[in-house]
A protein has these predicted regions:
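Thiamine diphosphate
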Residues: 1-112, 122
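Flexible, low-complexity linker and terminal segments
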Residues: 93-218
Length: 218
């Protein structure tokens, strides 16, 4: 079926809606969800949405369910490289609380940068449970300075995906939108040092569910 492609195209439309002169709302949050095979299927539609970009009052989030042990899938899956190829900054939660926190960061980053963002949910997290803090004050999201050479970097979604304009859009993704994403990550301490040791000689980096497995093994 074409559900995945239609869903991604609808999310693209949600980001363009706020740019219309008769828009009723400042922006719309668009969220796409699919397992790894759905991401494979919807790649072209998502790529077009990424190029068009996200609204500063909306935000576009791609949530992908990965099943690395093929627990309920025909083949094992890991979507990291596919998401990277689609120019989607990747948030990888390790538990249910992480999924809520990083999901909020992903939407906030999308609004601040004009990028679509992604959230990778592995089977262990999707099937997991836990007590979570849902207070709206749990996160203090910081929107960093987005000026370059004194000019504000505000992205306006654009569906003119034809030459030569599409080449300008690709340049904007790599030179402007990615820079915004780096500033967001730094300002919000997204990549944390969780066991600070002043005299450390060796560091270990891990993400998502594997982070908790590494901590447990140590």
């Amino acid at each position: 079926n074409v559900n995945e492609e239609l869903g991604a195209t609808a999310v693209m439309g949600s980001q363009l809606a706020g740019e219309q002169p008769d828009a009723k709302y400042d922006g719309v949050v668009g969220i796409w969800f699919g397992k790894a095979p759905g991401l494979d299927r919807a790649g072209d539609a998502i790529r077009h949405g990424v190029y068009a970009g996200a609204s500063q009052h909306g935000g576009a989030l791609v949530i992908v369910g990965d099943d690395p042990a093929a627990k309920s899938s025909t083949v094992p899956s890991s979507s990291d490289l596919a998401l990277m190829d689609l120019h989607l900054p990747l948030f990888y939660p390790g538990d249910v609380q992480d999924a809520l926190d990083l999901g909020r960061h992903a939407i906030a980053m999308s609004r601040a940068t004009g990028l679509w963002t992604s959230l990778k949910i592995v089977a262990a997290v999707a099937d997991g449970s836990g007590t979570v803090d849902v207070s709206p004050d749990r996160l203090s999201i910081v929107i960093p300075d987005m000026h370059v050479d004194g000019a504000p970097l505000i992205h306006h979604p654009d569906s003119r995906l034809l030459p030569p304009h599409n080449l300008d859009i690709e340049r904007d993704i790599h030179t402007v939108r990615f820079e915004r994403a780096r500033r967001y990550v730094a300002a919000n301490d997204v990549n944390r040092i969780t066991v600070p040791t002043p005299d450390a000689r060796i560091g270990m980096a891990s993400t998502g569910a594997k982070y908790h497995e590494v901590r447990e093994s140590l």
